[in-house]
Amino acid sequence: MEQKFIDLLEKGELKMWLDISTYCNAGCPACHRTDRFRGGLHHEKWLPMVQWSLEQFKKAYSIEFLNQIKSWEICGTFGDPVMNKDLYEICEYIITNSDSKINVDTNGSIRNAAWWTKLGKLPGIEVDFAVEGTTQEMQNYYRRKTNLYKILANMKAFTDAGGRANVFCVIHKHNQNHLFEIEALCKEYGATKFDWYESNRFYHGPRVHFMDENGNQDYLEQADGNYESPSEIGNKDGIVDYKSRTKFQKIAQKVLAANNDVDEMESMET
């Protein structure tokens, strides 16, 4: 028999999925929130800029309710949850008052290392970071306006403090032959799990056209292989140069510099 919402709630098996901010620092061309035709890769004009406050969250979800929830997925269809100014306090409220687990999905190129260290000290939190390249150029091809080295610095700060980091990588043609290299890089900076997913945003053909940050025409290309699982990619030794796989010396220097970045939350995208 199909279980209803109330059945899961009463059993303590309900999993919550929340979108707590429509703000985002990135400008991914195939994202639902991105205006890819007018230039600048800003948000669509019809999308209101809103975010939940801690007080709104506490009013909506009492401590009694928290204790009936198995887990929280704090994601973002139309924004990045780490752009929410009260995200840490919301997570702290959940963790302090229940045994619920929390998973946060983010591009990771937001906040400074000190903030991520603080988040990592909260028990029961996992974060999924978006890493799609081994260089800034490769990362920025889709994850526009993000900084690979800042993401890696934040991920390392989070995991060094005790947090668990996972990485999700969206596959396009520009990164399809670098997946194992990306995985190796992420694991050097604290990731314990690496998942890849072929982009499903090519609705009208193998290219998505857009106008970039500088007003120039550009396009994304769909991956031309089958990436349902890692085994279908082929022999990793034939794809990855393992002589350069484990050190990433130049990247390490840039990650160290990014670790000292200031918190840029005052300049939220509008």
Question: Predicted segment positions?
Answer:
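Conserved strand-turn element in the central/C-terminal portion of the radical SAM core barrel
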Residues: M155-H178, S199-R201
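Conserved alpha-helical substructure of the radical SAM core
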Residues: M1-E126, E137, Y141-Y149, A153, ...
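Active-site and channel-lining beta-strand-loop segments
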Residues: E269-T270
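Structural beta-sheet core signal
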Residues: V104, F129, V167-C169
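Hydrophobic anchor at the start of a short beta-strand
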Residues: I102, A165, F194
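Short, electropositive alpha-helical surface patch
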Residues: D86, I90-I94, V131, Q176-D195
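Short beta->alpha connector loops
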Residues: N107-R111, G133, H172-N175
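PAPS-dependent sulfotransferase catalytic core
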Residues: V208-E221, G225
